[in-house]
UniProtKB/Swiss-Prot annotation:
Annotated organism of origin: Pongo abelii (Sumatran orangutan)
Entry EC number(s): 2.5.1.18
Alphabetical list of InterPro entries matching this protein: Glutathione-S-Trfase_C-like, Glutathione-S-Trfase_C_sf, Glutathione_S-Trfase, Glutathione_S-Trfase_N, GST_C, GST_mu, GST_superfamily, Thioredoxin-like_sf
Protein name: Glutathione S-transferase Mu 2
Keyword hit for Transferase: yes
Gene designation per UniProt: GSTM2
PROSITE patterns, per the entry: GST_CTER (PS50405), GST_NTER (PS50404)
Matches recorded under Pfam families: GST_C, GST_N
């Protein structure tokens, strides 16, 4: 039976999961839930199923793989990564992996909070002002390595790609001062399975957020 990935019909938190499923050549199907238009943003497609799937903590995204039913995007990523040996191996790598995973989630949520805020236009300059400092830390961490933990790709590279690339969509010039981050994105997109997925009809780079967002809702 194929894996089932459930999420809104957007990029959102599922982007790195979809990329990891594709990279690992996993057999999966998507259950994409539609959200209604303003002002109600009807979520009944999801709410009608929310408590019928046997999820311990019902939420989107969810992944069902046989008897394994998982919510929380990073828990889903770690589950797939463990199956395919895409986690850090040494204690140092595991520590770096944990730090990166959480740091990336913090920065992902920073952008999301801004883009859902009614005062988006007022707050945007402050976000852009802090963006170079944020990206500089990732650039320093990556250094001359091909991947964030070294020579081996791991699941945190999939999160990093998503976070860095969506910031590039938000502010196209933001990576210009960080050639190693631009190279990282090119390297990731050049992976055979990823490149094929990006050319397929399954690829969903937009909308970044739901219809409730001020930016990234289309």
């Amino acid at each position: 039976m194929p894996i089932i990935l459930g999420y809104w019909n957007i990029r959102g938190l599922a982007h790195s999961i979809r990329l990891l499923l594709e990279y690992t050549d996993s057999s999966y199907e998507e259950k994409k839930y539609m959200m209604g238009d303003a002002p109600d943003y009807d979520r009944s497609q999801w709410l009608n199923e929310k408590f019928k799937l046997g999820l311990d903590f019902p939420n989107l995204p969810y992944l069902i793989d046989g008897t394994h039913k998982i919510t929380q995007s990073n828990a889903i990523l770690r589950y797939i990564a463990r199956k395919h040996n895409l986690c850090g191996e040494t204690e140092k790598e595991k520590i770096q992996e944990d730090i990166l995973e959480n740091q990336l989630m913090d920065n992902r949520m920073q952008l999301a909070r801004l883009c859902y805020n009614p005062d988006f236009e007022k707050l945007k300059p402050e976000y852009l002002e802090g963006l170079p400092e944020m990206l500089k830390l990732y650039s320093q961490f990556l250094g001359k390595q091909p991947w964030f933990l070294g020579d081996k790709i791991t699941f945190v590279d999939f999160i990093a790609y998503d976070v860095l690339e969506r910031n590039q969509v938000f502010e196209p010039s933001c990576l210009d001062a960080f050639p190693n981050l631009k190279d990282f994105i090119s390297r990731f997109e050049g992976l055979e399975k990823i490149s094929a997925y990006m050319k397929s009809s399954r690829f969903l780079p937009r909308p970044v957020f739901t219809k409730m967002a001020v930016w990234g809702n289309k």
